[in-house]
Amino acid sequence: MINLKNITVLGSGIMGHGIAQVSATAGYNVILRDIEQGFLDKAMEKIKWSLDKLATKGKISQQEADAIYSRITPIVNLAEAVKNAQLVIEVVPEIMELKKKVYAELDAVAGKDVIFASNTSTLPITEIANTISRPEKFIGIHFFNPPQLMKLVEVIPGEKTSQEVIDLTQEYVKSVKKESVLCRRDVPGFIINRLFIPMVHEACYMMDRTGATMTEIDSAVKFKLGFPMGIFELADFTGMDVIHKATIEMYLRDKKVISPHPTIEKMFDAKKLGQKSGEGFYKYSDEKYERVPLSEELADKCNPIQLVANILNNAAWLVTNKASDIEEIEKAAQLGLGLKKPLFETAKEIGIKNIVNELKQLASKHGKFYEPDPLLVSMQ
């Protein structure tokens, strides 16, 4: 296995400069590349601010902060940026044609042994890999925002990714003090979005079908299901643009994995993107982030079985389709969604039989989308 020292990060936005920072903190030599010097100047400023803040808080010494900063070199020229790279982490916007264009350029200038890792939350890995001359050296890597704070990284091999590249990527994730979960098959949404995105839509259907209010559903999700915040609150925190994009990508890949609720598209079109725009499902004031008033009293008014059924059916689907196993799904849900209690533990408390019955009832009223996964049926 190669001794990894030199990393190039393509794209210096929020995710890109965050990944550059965590890599430099772990001791790697990092080249940060973008198409304009102005973008790089801004990114380097943000990295400096972030490191100085850590030093002020006493998390690292000022000397360490300066050393980390000095390990990141901003470069505009692509050929120069990848000249000594062993691993290239690409963090350009999630637009398939743009990614393919970047890889065509990259494939032409990078050394033949260089590994390419695409930071993506939903785009098909194999499809991008097949556009280059080295699909066996291509892998998906999904950091969560902000990379400096979020512990979880999904690692997604394409159909042709070599075992050596999978091992090396997982080693890299461990070296930057993150926890990796391996999504063994390149399925729509990978693990986290396969659980989270359909659940947002399901919460909208739940309002329509049960008459429960937003704060009742959110309170039940927080207090009964052990989420760190309500599902609508989490959607506002994530951003409707992100959810809308993930919905489209997942739906394009497989119409059976998601049943889009029209509300998401309407909110996206109306630019109600959540916290970042001041309004999503809830309204936010500019001055500071206010928590939505959720309570155990409100939670008692709502039975969240429809939502549990949805997320569990999707978790079971991941196992049945050999993309993951229960242990990895629980790890992903804990680190990526902040779940305080394992999903399948909650399911057993509610009763798998009750969940399967709920899915059967939903399927009889609303169609095949709700048919229970064979794994859940076998567990009851």
Locate the predicted segments by residue.
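NAD(P)+-binding Rossmann beta1-loop-alpha1 motif at the extreme N-terminus of oxidoreductases
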Residues: 1-53, 57, 109
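NAD(P)-dependent Rossmann-like dehydrogenase/reductase catalytic/cofactor-binding core
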Residues: 2-3, 26-28, 178-185, 208-380
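Rossmann-like NAD(P)-binding element
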Residues: 39-42, 53-116, 122-124
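Rossmann-like dinucleotide-binding cores of NAD(P)H-dependent redox enzymes
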Residues: 32-49, 53-65, 155-166, 180-181, ...
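Rossmann-fold dinucleotide-binding core
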Residues: 115-194, 198, 229, 240, ...
